[in-house]
């Protein structure tokens, strides 16, 4: 049930009837911000009236008389300076809310399926995941869940940094210092691996001979040297195993099969170089291979911007890998849409790779490319979120601290729960709190991380919404005839303003998901779930459920509660957040 789309169709029909079809793109239908402006609002009428040179009130009256919302709207009225407010009919709302309780997927219709590649998380190998990976991982995973739920074929792509200079440095360091890397036990592996990386980076920056040796090992690795490949595989396997533990704990759907790292495209690179040369897109300059882009000119000299795709020593660059990656996703995976959740600093680099791929004919203009920029995680001083010593906070450290805080919070509430249940609840609350704190903010903005706020049971937080679900679950634990909810004789009827507002919000779940899927902005879903939880709280406060004397009223309100619980649970699930029957 997509009310917004239904109303937009009726708007288009009306504009066609009054010969203003050419102005369709000027009109928007959106949910009203306040109940006094109705349930929905049509915006943009003032733009059409200006084009037609007709007073806005006169044009709006013509439109209101033309639009067919019979049975859907109770009131349609003009609101200065140029809005049309729509108040939905309670009878129509009753009919629709009674219909969705019997439908699969909460009444959400599947849309035409597309192949959508989502590039997210993408940590570098040889390092532990840190808080900087959190937004890409969590937001990307939520969008993958939502698009899958709507019926798309989603291809998750974890484009890990498993190739390149850092491996030349590590191999050179292990060789130089005669490190027996195979002797490390499981608990030492990832921390020692990161230590080796840090030390090798110091030598790389300070010792020209070590830097040259590192570059030689990169080339040997790329050419398939057995010794280099053995070390490389061991290092990659350690990192992948460690990252998977983080993903599992975060309830992120990424698995080993979703890894499409830089190394995957290595065998394509010689062809890419040759093909770009044959198509006169790449040239040799000072023994390196370069593609010049007219669209990206050097601002000082107004010369075409050069993108190096192969170095003098024969080594390849990230740009070469990205071109091959785009080619693979379009020609092999047949992507219709490709979404990148990666660092905003990569934007220019991505645009260059896309442009080269377009010019080479690897992709068509029909493929939609989107770089969904993510803001930064800040501390209370609005500085990048780091340890007191200035180091980046490890993701495992953040998760452990969140668990401990949630555990103590539960104990302080004096819940009469056994140890196993407290642990389970602390896990659900802590992971939910961290994920929701990321997802509830507009992904394009920086935000301040605050422990007290994210673990609060009031306000727009995961614990508040999780508790709303738990409260509804507790209602159904008190009744013995849950099967009677399915009986047709018990219909939902809306006798109060609280019930009407709750029912409308329930019917808006579908259009909310469509908006989030189109824009890649899960904070809109978070806002919806918070609004739904708040409206249920008002309904619960003003409309007795189990204590009402009328059986029909009781089951009407139980059905509203049941649908609310289903949507809260599904909505949180689409954010990658679990619920609990107790709290």
UniProtKB/Swiss-Prot annotation:
Name assigned to this protein: Arginine--tRNA ligase
Complex formation: Monomer.
Statement: the UniProt record of this protein carries the keyword Ligase: yes
Top enzyme class: ligase
InterPro entries (UniProt xref): aa-tRNA-synth_I_CS, Arg-tRNA-ligase, Arg-tRNA-synth_N, Arg-tRNA-synth_N_sf, ArgRS_core, DALR_anticod-bd, Rossmann-like_a/b/a_fold, tRNAsynth_Ia_anticodon-bd
Top-level division of the source organism's lineage: Bacteria
EC number: 6.1.1.19
Short motif 'HIGH' region, span: 123-133
Taxonomic placement: Bacteria, Pseudomonadati, Pseudomonadota, Gammaproteobacteria, Enterobacterales
Source species: Blochmanniella floridana
Catalytic activity reported: tRNA(Arg) + L-arginine + ATP = L-arginyl-tRNA(Arg) + AMP + diphosphate
Major localization listed first in the record, in broad terms: cytoplasm
Family: Belongs to the class-I aminoacyl-tRNA synthetase family.
Subcellular locations according to the entry: Cytoplasm
One of the record's GO cellular component terms: cytoplasm
């Amino acid at each position: 049930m997509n009310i917004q789309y239904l109303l937009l169709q009726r708007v288009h029909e009306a504009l066609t009837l009054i010969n203003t079809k050419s102005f369709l793109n000027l009109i928007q239908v959106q949910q009203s911000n306040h109940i006094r402006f109705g349930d929905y609002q049509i915006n943009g009428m003032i733009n059409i009236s200006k084009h037609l040179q007709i007073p806005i009130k006169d044009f709006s009256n013509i439109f209101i008389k033309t639009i067919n919302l019979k049975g859907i709207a109770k009131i349609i009225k003009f609101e200065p300076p140029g809005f049309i407010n729509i108040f939905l009919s309670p009878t129509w709302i009753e009919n629709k809310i009674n219909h969705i309780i019997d439908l699969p997927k909460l009444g959400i219709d599947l849309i035409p399926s597309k192949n959508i590649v989502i590039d997210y998380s993408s940590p570098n190998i040889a390092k532990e995941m840190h808080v900087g990976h959190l937004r890409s991982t969590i937001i990307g995973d939520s969008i993958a869940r939502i698009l899958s739920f709507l019926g798309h074929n989603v291809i998750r792509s974890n484009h890990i940094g498993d190739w390149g200079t850092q491996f030349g440095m590590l191999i050179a360091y292990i060789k130089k210092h005669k490190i027996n890397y195979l002797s490390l036990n499981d608990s030492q592996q990832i921390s020692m691996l990161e230590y080796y990386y840090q030390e090798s980076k110091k030598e790389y920056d300070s010792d020209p001979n070590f830097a040259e040796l590192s570059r030689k090992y990169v080339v040997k690795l790329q050419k398939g040297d057995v010794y280099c490949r053995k070390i490389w595989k061991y290092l990659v396997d350690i990192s992948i195993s460690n990252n998977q533990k983080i993903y599992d704990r975060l309830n992120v759907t990424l698995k080993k099969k979703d890894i499409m790292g830089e190394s995957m495209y290595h065998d394509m690179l010689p062809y890419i170089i040759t093909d770009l040369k044959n198509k006169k897109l790449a040239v040799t300059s000072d023994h390196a291979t370069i593609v010049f882009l007219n669209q990206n000119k050097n601002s000082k000299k107004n010369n075409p911007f050069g993108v190096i795709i192969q170095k003098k020593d024969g080594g390849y660059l990230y740009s070469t890998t990205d071109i091959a990656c785009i080619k693979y996703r379009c020609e092999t995976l047949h992507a219709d849409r490709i979404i990148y959740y990666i660092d905003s600093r990569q934007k220019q680099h991505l645009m260059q790779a896309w442009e080269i791929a377009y010019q080479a004919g690897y992709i068509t203009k029909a493929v939609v490319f989107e770089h969904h920029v993510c803001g930064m995680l800040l501390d209370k001083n609005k500085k990048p979120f780091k340890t007191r010593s200035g180091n980046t906070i490890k993701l495992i450290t953040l998760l452990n601290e969140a668990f401990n805080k949630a555990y103590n919070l539960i104990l302080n509430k004096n819940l009469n729960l056994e140890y196993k249940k407290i642990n389970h609840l602390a896990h659900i609350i802590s992971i939910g709190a961290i994920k929701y704190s990321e997802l509830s903010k507009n992904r394009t903005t920086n935000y301040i991380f605050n422990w007290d706020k994210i673990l609060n049971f009031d306000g727009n937080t995961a614990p508040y919404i999780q508790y709303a679900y738990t409260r509804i679950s507790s209602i159904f634990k008190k009744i013995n005839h849950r099967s009677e909810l399915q009986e047709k004789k018990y219909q939902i009827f809306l006798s109060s303003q609280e019930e009407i507002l709750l029912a409308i919000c329930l019917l808006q779940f579908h259009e909310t998901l469509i908006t989030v899927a189109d824009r890649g902005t899960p904070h809109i879903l978070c806002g919806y779930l918070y609004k739904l939880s708040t409206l249920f709280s008002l309904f619960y406060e003003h409309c007795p459920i189990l204590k009402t004397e009328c059986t029909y009223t009781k089951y009407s309100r139980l059905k509203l509660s049941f649908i609310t619980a289903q949507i809260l649970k599904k909505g949180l699930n689409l954010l990658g957040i679990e619920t609990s029957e107790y709290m």
